[in-house]
Amino acid sequence: MMSVLFLLVGLGLILSGANFLTNGAAALAKRFNISSLVIGLTIVAFGTSAPELTVSIVSAINGSAELSIGNVVGSNIFNILMIVGVTAVVAPITITKGTLTKEIPLAILSCVVVLICANDVFLETGTENILNRADGLLMLCFFAIFLGYTFAIAHDNTGEEQAEIRPLSTWRCLLYIVGGLVALIFGGRLFVNGSSEIARSLGVGESVIGLTLVAMGTSLPELATSVVAALKKNPEIAIGNVIGSNLFNVFFVLGMSATITPLPLGGITNVDLFYLLAVSLLLFFAGRYYKVRTITRVEGVFMIFAYVVYIGYLIYML
């Protein structure tokens, strides 16, 4: 019972901490005349993936590598199948040409990078499947390239609506930042400890908890944002949230975690990694062929069903 309480309290602290940290950092940056464009592409983008980053890094430091990797892989699968799926059921999603030809292929590339880095035994580059520091640095290099690309295309669309930033006094900005960081760190420890204890009490591997419970919990901000956007007749926001979050999760969150400490895959198998690649390809083909550049309600229902099938597989394999 206490482990569930730790899990819920930890998740609450992570989500609120990410919100306070993002608001404080954005307001402070604005006071130093940093443009809304730069703030949106860096601080706000970081804030939405702060739960995944916190959980994965704390898990890596605690020696729970399967929880760290499972969180990223599971979150990315959840993002595509459930967030896009549910949003499309609420309102069909129109995909821009740039997203279909550039951003989604980048997400597919991130899956391929993880597959290659995680298959040391098959590729005969090692005796154990592990994401080592070299793999982590490679992912961080890809993240730097992605960030540069994001800035480049953003400057070509400077007329588009930019993030609204609530003005705060300097001392309040600092209070938000420090308080947010404390909440993230403390909440991350509670969440990871609670998750690990639940795994032990149920007799299942941390990989399963990471791929399911932890992944769903850390993806709640993106789900809430996307559904609200769909209800306000702006479902296209979901695609941007999902693609940006998935790229951030693989290239930065997983890259940073593996750089801090090598991550053995353990219970994370090629089935999970190939499923992530498959659903990323599904997102591309759904927007490319069935109804050009649109995710329909039918496709949304299929995506939700595909997620249920994946969860069913994980339960069956216990």
Predicted segments — roles?
Residues 1-318:
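Hydrophobic alpha-helical segments, chiefly the membrane-spanning helices
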